[in-house]
């Protein structure tokens, strides 16, 4: 084996020279001519070998290749000939004098044919071997071994050439065509000793130097590395190269044994001959390394990705498994881009805190090595691990996508076959139910006003009830057609159309072809419609189709040739262009010109005239308003008359159009008595107190003093002066007339005031719309009060008149019987009044703190509350002192939010509650919108699950459980107004929506009975046993969710349904009606009625239709 060193010849810049370490030859390489010369020393046979090679194009075949062998000596009686190359084949052979010699298969062998030449011909390329029966054919078999000498026969006999080194024969593929793998990569071109295979030039040749310039101790002819024994150890030594020495095979060289004297005779070779390839030690990657950097990415993929257990493995488990080998920089999982199904293919990329690529590559290598030695098993599933080299990730991904596409096609075919079989079964069922579909020619009488003689499609009630169909199913299936209404009747379903054509179109397209899922038969059933056309008679109006939104059918115009088509198209285009041109001319030219000519600045005379007219109109309006402003009389005896009297004759008022447009809204007419209640801003003082209630103001006005009335009159006089200042001047006659009226009214008012001052203020007349009592009504006058206390009687006597009436009612003083009071009657009356005041104050305190008085049965007679013994308080009495017990039918806000403003009196809280109730309009819209969003998200989630089921072809329990968990609503538990704890909704829930699942321990019926007795014995007051069927019971007493806190109510808001999920029965709570936020959820327990009265449980729901007992 020769080891070559490279140096440069300064004379030829395009040449590089290699020299072998044994010095028997040199190798020149010229990149310009692609010529390879080997000049060797004469060997034992005296041959000199010259090789010339020129590559040609064409499917990997070598053309124009010539091998010649010239000998220095000559020998007689030896056949002379020429070897010419032929095409490649898997079995190579020599042809010599009609004798075929077959050689073993080798990838680098060429088939030769030998032709004997005439001795008279002179061929410069003739071959005259030195030996008549032996020649060397050089090559390698599939195991890399060299072939030895081959015997070439001289006769027509046939023999097989056998290798002296290896007798094995293998099928070896052809060597692939050489390509430039790493081309134009910056990571490679920046290397110091990179050779560009395209340009055939060393990129950094100008920067290179001879080794003698770098290290002068190195010899100029080169050096070789030899192994010598130094101090009993074999070491590698660098020595100067000797070109005259012959090279030796290192496998044949031996090294003397340095062991004991008994084993000195044995010699050992420098190294053993390897029979198979071994791994090259991993070399650290640096700036001098060739090729791409080592891979830091690991590809993880499942062995069997169609396994159903793979869906249960989360990505975090795989990520955590490979995290133990090093720090992760990136983790990604891949899925099918078409079906979105997981490929169970993952990419793990490592990094290192130091940023060195060798450390990251080492971590990836260790991950692959450990997974190859021990199988990578994660949660019971096996995975394969490979380094991401040569686009390994893309190859695996493409293979898996193709496999998945084939599987989805198979699933689709199976589904189509199942659908066809279901259609056949439904057709058979349809034949059996032929008697069900009886044609109905007319619409029932109660529906005729609604249908209004329009076409309809009919489905019989018997068919619907047998198949278990609903009207909402038809709405969703026929939404593509223009249906007017969907009606449900005792006779069946009616689908109304506005147009007969639409009804016939739906009938032809869907009748017998539309399929729906039957809830009773558990199969798809075809739907057959019956068309009911509108009736016509000579007595009724002829039916006319209701105009629809659909456009009329356009007749198809056919043209004979291309010219007619072009003419018609050009005609339509010209018409459209003409229309658009006219509209543009109107918009851009005519319109602006008209507006410019009609501007007011072009007609100044008309503008001035219009302004003058408007000024005259304003003057007339002000004059009329001044004439209508008249003085008003103020007479206290005409207050009620002024309020009730109306003008006898309504005077007509004719206004012009402009006045009618500018007419202001009329003010409400007030009686003159209300002038006393008005407070002027310009008056410094007011004679009346301002109150919110008008009746109170009226009462206060009657009790005002005469001095206040004088002040009021002064104020009115001042106001009249102000009105005179801004009013128009009147004539002398009008002034005299008004002066006389004012003088008379003033005299009358003074006289009446003097008369009224002699009467008690309480009995003066009041200026109110309706009569008002002098004293407030007494509470004992109510029909619901039977007894009258002493204090009520004292309050009833207001004046002397009442005392006289009392004397008339009671008997005479002689007939009265009095007990012996011993002079303590007044004390007793005082004591009774004091006790009454104390009870009234305690009642007021209870109302202020509790908003309700305590039940009297809670207090024992003549015994203090502290001295009373412990006793059980019934649930009915708890509502008197527990606030949450009183709000049975109101939403209970159980979610506590910290708010300091809530720490206030109950009166303020009640006011805020009323304000919140008034402002629920926008909140309800927000709740509806949020619920609508939830339903939309649930529908999208359901569609995704159905798509995944259709793609995989299997329905796993995991999908059903995820679907069930997705649909549940947010609920919580808190203290209940019915009993103990209760379940409450945190957000609005619509009717027929799922609320929560009743979760617990699944047990048998005998075990449930035993546990129930045990719970009663241990003192557990509430047991949460829910029966599914005769044999199965759900026990949520100790192992269950919060659904067990839901209470019973005779008017429930929810209901319990038993559904199947994955072959198992489950209990799910659904809403019966719309439920508000923070409202308690209830459902009917439906206990069996007990005959024994002692075992019956009282119901505490408090509903209007409460049964009174649970069982």
UniProtKB/Swiss-Prot annotation:
MF term (GO), any: RNA binding
Post-SET domain sequence ranges: 1095-1111
Residue span of region Disordered: 1-150, 234-272, 648-714, 891-937
Motif RxxxRR motif positions after renumbering to this chain: 935-940
GO BP annotations listed: ascospore formation; cellular response to stress; cellular response to xenobiotic stimulus; meiotic DNA double-strand break formation; methylation; negative regulation of transcription by RNA polymerase II; positive regulation of synaptonemal complex assembly; positive regulation of transcription by RNA polymerase II
Enzyme class (EC, first level): transferase
Domain of life: Eukaryota
Basic residues biased stretches: 263-272
Quaternary state and interactors: Component of the Set1C/COMPASS complex.
Record note on domains: The RxxxRR motif forms an adapter helix that bridges the nucleosome and ubiquitin.
Protein name per the record: Histone-lysine N-methyltransferase, H3 lysine-4 specific
Organism encoding this protein: Candida glabrata (strain ATCC 2001 / BCRC 20586 / JCM 3761 / NBRC 0622 / NRRL Y-65 / CBS 138) (Yeast)
Gene (UniProt): SET1
